[in-house]
Amino acid sequence: MALTFYLLVALVVLSYKSFSSLGCDLPQTHSLGNRRALILLAQMRRISPFSCLKDRHDFEFPQEEFDDKQFQKAQAISVLHEMIQQTFNLFSTKDSSAALDETLLDEFYIELDQQLNDLESCVMQEVGVIESPLMYEDSILAVRKYFQRITLYLTEKKYSSCAWEVVRAEIMRSFSLSINLQKRLKSKE
């Protein structure tokens, strides 16, 4: 029993050290990925946004989660991870495949998946053994509610072309705001 405990402790320490040696440079790595994702989102546009003005909607982006001056790096990484995960979930539905260019969607999935992998290693490095991502549950919950509103909107609009155009533009806006958050994190370092 004692041997199992010490083995478990040793594995945790070794895992933590291996994550720490990854040298997480989130702002540089993630910002580049966000820019590529923004380019792909822009290329997905199928109709003019002006033809969808009547469908505009305020999804109540959780701006305060991206504006807080006291934002800790671990909290920012957790929020960014949740945003990327929810974006991945939103765009990986059969309804998005029907409305958007599948080749661009595939590239977008690959980009989001890479960002999620980068963020997961950063979360482990920044949060470590001391803190828990659950400490930032309010911030993560705000992001989840934001994406629930987007999903509800798409459902209410029956996944129309205009609804997808409005959502595409909204996700572009949220990615732009996350790039600004990363710039602030970089300036704090």
Curated annotation (Swiss-Prot):
Gene Ontology biological process: adaptive immune response; B cell activation involved in immune response; cellular response to virus; defense response to virus; humoral immune response; natural killer cell activation involved in immune response; response to exogenous dsRNA; T cell activation involved in immune response
An annotated GO cellular component: extracellular region
Pfam families assigned to the protein according to its UniProt record, in alphabetical order: Interferon
Annotated InterPro entries: 4_helix_cytokine-like_core, Interferon_alpha/beta/delta
Any one GO molecular function term: type I interferon receptor binding
Signal peptide (from-to): 1-23
Major localization listed first in the record, in broad terms: secreted
Compartment(s): Secreted
SMART domains, sorted: IFabd
Keywords: Antiviral defense, Cytokine, Disulfide bond, Secreted, Signal
Disulfide bonds: C24-C122, C52-C162
Task performed by this protein: Produced by macrophages, IFN-alpha have antiviral activities. Interferon stimulates the production of two enzymes: a protein kinase and an oligoadenylate synthetase.
Family statement drawn from the similarity comment of this UniProt entry: Belongs to the alpha/beta interferon family.
Name recorded for this polypeptide: Interferon alpha-8
Species this chain originates from: Homo sapiens (Human)
